[in-house]
Amino acid sequence: MFTKAEDVLRYIRDEDVQFIDVRFCDLPGIMQHFTIPTQVFAESVFTDGLMFDGSSIRGFQAIHESDMLLLPDPQTAFVDPFREHKTLAMTFFIHDPITKEQYSRDPRNIAKKAETYLRGTSIADTAYFGPEAEFYIFDDVRYDYNPYGSMHHVDSVEAAWNTSRKEEGGNLGYKPRFKGGYFPVPPTDHFTDLRSEMTRVLYETGITVEMQHHEVGTAGQAEIDIRYDTLLKTADNLMLYKYVIRNVARSRGKTVTFMPKPLFEDNGSGMHVHSSLWKDGEPLFYSPNGYGGLSDTARYYIGGLLHHAPALLAFTNPTTNSYRRLVPGYEAPVNLVYSARNRSACCRIPLGGDSPKAKRVEFRVPDPSCNPYLAFAAMLMAGLDGIRNKIDPPDPIDKDLYELPPDELAAVPQVPGSLEKVLDALEADNDFLREGDVFTTDLIETWLEYKRLNEVDAIRLRPHPYEFTLYYDI
């Protein structure tokens, strides 16, 4: 919307903007904000910044060194369609208040450094990313945990388990079965108008949508695909995408979750990520003579993704819930191989006709619980390491990997089965991320400590309700 400070300030004056919503991303990937009146938003903010308490933000500073500085990024500004008073929202970079250097734990800074590193390699000058984020639309969610009990419950007018319940006006049916929600027309698809409204608002905020549809899961699983863009821009778009989806749903009395696996015995929500490298305006992943139309550069890029996948998943699939999705039987990509067209492989080469510009790699493992700034940056660094070191991936497999006999399947490498395992893999394999100081040692150590303490240990130490079913009378 804007390219420089003057554009923002002129728009504020000309359009009678009343508030500036200051946004930045915490380490796990949740957008934070505070709001200031435009009367106190002076031009000096673009040079002197705004201060905030970094010790109160997850994964940031200790209390004895808590002051942090925010500097605006004018290119991220948009008019927030959900605010009662005209508000211009803008995402900021985080800096050290003394040295003014960019903060090493700022996720946006890491994404920016990854793009700078790419240009410095001379391999390519631009990386494009295109995520396909899935989510569930529920009518109601309740959950609780305390030392003596726990529960969670979700519900949806569209849920398969509600075919027999009494509903106001009568139960009219048309509820997708478990794993039976892919592409039905209304009335089975209850939420097509809601997704269209989400699409409309996404366009209003500057995000191009290519498609929206019902996904496989019952109870309102959905997908809205946005247009690819450069790494940092796509990560910004995905954060805004989540904001829009959640708020449109809430305005219609619904609630959305991007949890990878909110339902047992139905498909999880993934986020397939398409990526490609370009140089001087030309695509680098196409060769008419290569397998699947891939160039050597693309093949080595895939080699890097597969070689570093156990460590990479610490950023692309960073929650304990991620590994409830990554299991056989629910269309999840658990096999660390690549293939043309084959959706059961974790790396797929989508059909794009004969157009070199359409040639790309689809990494099917990630899920929308990730911090996109860190996930896309880590993917790029893994792919570049593969190119730089000419890492050949294993031979492609064009069979249906879900139907392989046990002896053949045993030879196919699998994704790690838990967050704990991928964190261990990241601890052992992170040199590729630290190239060019894109991911600092401090960032990696902070990520490992945060995830182990606040997620792995937090889950490990608490009794699970199903354990009572299994063991109460043992």
From Swiss-Prot:
Mg(2+) 1 binds at E132, H272, E362. It is an enzyme of class 6 (ligase). The gene is glnA. The modification O-AMP-tyrosine is found at Y402. Its cofactor is Mg(2+). One of its GO terms (cellular component) is membrane. One of its GO terms (molecular function) is metal ion binding. ATP binds at E210, H274, S275, S276, R343, R348, K357. It is found in: Cytoplasm. It comes from the Bacteria. It catalyses: L-glutamate + NH4(+) + ATP = L-glutamine + ADP + phosphate + H(+). Binds 2 Mg(2+) ions per subunit. Residues 15-99 form the GS beta-grasp domain. It comes from Frankia alni. PROSITE patterns: GLNA_1, GLNA_ADENYLATION, GLNA_ATP, GS_BETA_GRASP, GS_CATALYTIC. This is Glutamine synthetase. The keyword Iron-sulfur does not apply. InterPro entries: Gln_synt_N (IPR008147), Gln_synt_N_sf (IPR036651), Gln_synth/guanido_kin_cat_dom (IPR014746), Gln_synth_cat_dom (IPR008146), Gln_synth_gly_rich_site (IPR027303), Gln_synth_I (IPR004809), Gln_synth_I_adenylation_site (IPR001637), Gln_synth_N_conserv_site (IPR027302). PANTHER family: GLUTAMINE SYNTHETASE, LENGSIN. One of its GO terms (biological process) is nitrogen utilization. Catalyzes the ATP-dependent biosynthesis of glutamine from glutamate and ammonia. Residues 107-474 form the GS catalytic domain. L-glutamate binds at N267, G268, R325, E331, R343, R364. Two forms of glutamine synthetase (GSI and GSII) can be found in this nitrogen fixing bacteria, GSI is a typical prokaryotic glutamine synthetase whereas GSII is similar to the eukaryotic enzyme. Mg(2+) 2 binds at E134, E215, E223. Keywords: ATP-binding, Cytoplasm, Ligase, Magnesium, Metal-binding, Nitrogen fixation, Nucleotide-binding, Phosphoprotein. Pfam families: Gln-synt_C (PF00120), Gln-synt_N (PF03951).
